[in-house]
Amino acid sequence: MESTSPALSVSIAVLTALLGLTGFGIYTAFGPPSRQLDDPFDDHDD
């Protein structure tokens, strides 16, 4: 079995972290937790 290069391992780890953060952000923005978010423009009607 061949060993993988460190650059490939680091790039896969960074890609996984970015995809996880993106998924968490989409879930927070559009999923069930979005009901708790406030709209600052609605709070400050002029």
From Swiss-Prot:
Membrane-topology annotation of the record: Single-pass membrane protein
GO BP, sorted A to Z: photosynthesis
InterPro entries in the cross-refs: PSII_PsbN
Superkingdom of this protein's organism: Bacteria
Gene Ontology cellular-component terms listed: plasma membrane-derived thylakoid membrane
Keywords: Membrane, Thylakoid, Transmembrane, Transmembrane helix
Localization annotation: Cellular thylakoid membrane
Record flagged with keyword Membrane: yes
Record-annotated membrane-spanning stretches: 10-30
Role, per record: May play a role in photosystem I and II biogenesis.
Cited NCBIfam families: PRK13183.1
Recorded family membership: Belongs to the PsbN family.
PANTHER family per record: PROTEIN PSBN (PTHR35326:SF3)
Protein's recorded name: Protein PsbN
